[in-house]
């Protein structure tokens, strides 16, 4: 009986959190940035450590953006599974892909923040977009994000996430 109460309590709690998120987080509009020569440069920054199984798909989706002024930077954070080799091969044939080899992490830094910091230092865009290596972008992700950032006074946007399972 106690397990039933715990289960019902958990469902009520998670339903409340979901409801609050639906209210607070607005989806990006389906509008695209109007054509102009003044589109800000966007840097898509991808920290990657041992992501050989997903990195090519991530990079490929990032490069297929319907936006004229962007670069993709991928930092190989000392991977041991072949991620660096895949990135070296891709950056050799793709112009706006920048492959960065991560530096040794200082003692007072954590791994992912250090990788993101290195990416931010190398990026040349006015807008920095950070994604994980297991993320695939829709072709209109960058235009929608730029449009949303220009329409509202915001310093960050959160995209719609499509998950394969409940536990993701």
List where the protein language model places each region.
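Short, well-formed alpha-helical segments that are part of the catalytic scaffolds
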Residues: 23-32, 51-64
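Conserved donor NDP-sugar-binding/catalytic core segment of glycosyltransferases
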Residues: 143-167
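Cell-envelope/extracellular polymer assembly enzymes that use nucleotide-activated donors
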Residues: 40-43, 71
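N-terminal membrane-anchoring/stem segments of glycan-assembly enzymes
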Residues: 1-36
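Short aromatic/hydrophobic "clamp" motif used to bind/position activated sugar donors
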Residues: 116, 128
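Active-site acidic Asp-centered loop
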Residues: 77, 131-133, 158
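Acidic donor-binding segment of Leloir-type glycosyltransferases
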Residues: 59-105
């Amino acid at each position: 009986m106690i397990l039933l109460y715990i289960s019902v309590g958990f469902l009520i709690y998670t339903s409340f959190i979901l409801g609050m998120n639906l209210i607070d987080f607005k989806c990006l509009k389906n509008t695209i940035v109007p054509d102009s020569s003044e589109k800000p440069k966007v840097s898509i920054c991808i920290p990657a450590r041992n992501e050989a199984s997903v990195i090519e798909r991530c990079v490929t989706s990032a490069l297929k953006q319907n936006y004229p002024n962007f670069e993709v930077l991928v930092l190989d954070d000392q991977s041991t599974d072949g991620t660096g080799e895949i990135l070296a091969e891709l950056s050799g044939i793709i112009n706006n892909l920048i492959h960065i080899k991560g530096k040794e992490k200082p003692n007072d830094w954590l791994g992912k923040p250090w990788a993101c910091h290195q990416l931010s230092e190398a990026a040349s865009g006015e807008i920095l977009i950070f994604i994980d290596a297991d993320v695939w972008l829709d072709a209109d992700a960058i235009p929608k994000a730029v449009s949303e950032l220009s329409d509202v006074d915001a310093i960050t946007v959160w995209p719609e996430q499509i998950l394969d399972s409940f536990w993701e």
